[in-house]
């Protein structure tokens, strides 16, 4: 968790950007793994809730009343039976105090807060929900059907959150650097142990274990597959074959939930064939070009299409494409070899903002 001052400053900036009304930031709830009585999936807090309220516990809602300059952390304290299973945890009031929030209230108070705001015809801001339990909660509070909630979400709040989360502070950059180190260790672990005869699943497990061993977790489900033509190929029980390439797409998430994401392709037996090396070298050239060009003030699309042209030129040299490169890229022919964007923003979500 960052300092109390960090979360306080973020909420103050958010209030200035949104200007008026009440902001509801829903934290996530525990999600059953495969049944209500059979364990729970590892809990991951909503990133925007984390950004402004910092707490990682389930079942919380942050309320920011801009007009009355009042902030409240909503949630129920655990009871004695919960303590038997989960141990003693901070009260909601304690958690509020940790992040500079002066008020706390049980979950039943949220209905009263929202009802009062609706009665006064005040603006109520929420972000587009992505979990169905939160969609039901919003429907229960605001009477908005889940199918209509994306359109009903506050554009002012969306723009403000995107603006703030898109620009990283120094402490966030340090977290991203930590995430990059974890990702590096995951990839080098994969490279070190990959060899013919192992299964994709085994190596994938070692990759995930590396992330966990550094006190973190994976930032998304690890992709490790000999079928690099399938962009999101999960590790299977297939044996690694001598002479083939394997694609590894993985990343780590720090304890503060900042993410890394890198993709590398390498030979299973440690040595490229001539053809593999030729194609790899085209990708490496494009990679180095992007690193050299990308800097503040340069448009992402200029870097993306510059890379597309390098790749198409390379494919022409290898006899895998033909035609005028400029026209081919304009018509989208490069998508035969690069069927996706060059990259994406990083932050608390692996595809940030």
Descriptions of predicted regions:
Residues 1-353:
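Active-site neighborhoods and metal-handling regions in enzymes and metal-associated proteins
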